[in-house]
């Protein structure tokens, strides 16, 4: 039976783990069938290769409790139920960092300018936007009438 479990690496008292697919009877440090991501418990950073995880879960691999909780947080089981076949190559779950005093102020200012521009565009109905776009496109494509000289055609009338 194939298990999805953690393989420890890193310095003493600074563990990091690789998420691997391995035979259940193999020891922890044995050569894995496939490496499927990593997990750092100190920074809570996790990177998962969804295509590989979905493949092994479909084949019947059993995750350990820790790997199971990581897969739930990343939404792998929802992808498996929905039938997505590795649409996303990998998922990065960033660490939960505590915001500093100066960072939230800058973060609040930046979205405010973006929302003003979005509000201006949102106020104009979609039909007016499309009409205005076609008028400007037509004006750009056709030269002004003053510059274009139309040849006058004289029709000869035979008597």
UniProtKB/Swiss-Prot annotation:
Keywords in alphabetical order: Ribonucleoprotein, Ribosomal protein
Region (Disordered): 102-159
Any one GO cellular component localisation term in the record: small ribosomal subunit
Any GO BP: translation
One term of GO molecular function: structural constituent of ribosome
InterPro entries recorded: Ribosomal_bS16, Ribosomal_bS16_CS, Ribosomal_bS16_dom_sf
Disulfide bonding pattern of the chain: none
Residue ranges, compositional bias (Acidic residues): 120-129
Extent of Low complexity compositional bias: 102-119, 130-145
PANTHER family associated with the record: 30S RIBOSOMAL PROTEIN S16, SMALL RIBOSOMAL SUBUNIT PROTEIN BS16M
Family: Belongs to the bacterial ribosomal protein bS16 family.
Name this protein carries in UniProt: Small ribosomal subunit protein bS16
UniProt organism field: Synechococcus sp. (strain JA-2-3B'a(2-13))
């Amino acid at each position: 039976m194939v298990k999805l479990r953690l393989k420890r690496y890193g310095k003493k008292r600074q563990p990091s783990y690789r998420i691997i697919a391995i035979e259940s009877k193999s020891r922890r440090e044995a050569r894995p069938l496939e490496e499927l991501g990593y997990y750092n418990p100190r920074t809570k950073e996790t990177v998962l290769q969804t295509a590989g995880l979905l493949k092994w879960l479909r084949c019947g691999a059993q995750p350990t409790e820790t790997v199971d909780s990581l897969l739930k947080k990343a939404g792998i089981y929802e992808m498996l139920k929905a039938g997505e076949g590795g649409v996303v190559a990998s998922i990065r779950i960033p660490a939960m960092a505590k915001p500093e005093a100066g960072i939230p102020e800058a973060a609040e200012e930046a979205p405010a300018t973006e929302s003003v521009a979005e509000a201006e565009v949102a106020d104009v109905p979609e039909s007016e936007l499309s009409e205005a776009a076609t008028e400007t496109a037509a004006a750009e494509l056709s030269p002004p009438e003053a510059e274009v000289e139309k040849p006058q055609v004289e029709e000869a009338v035979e008597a």
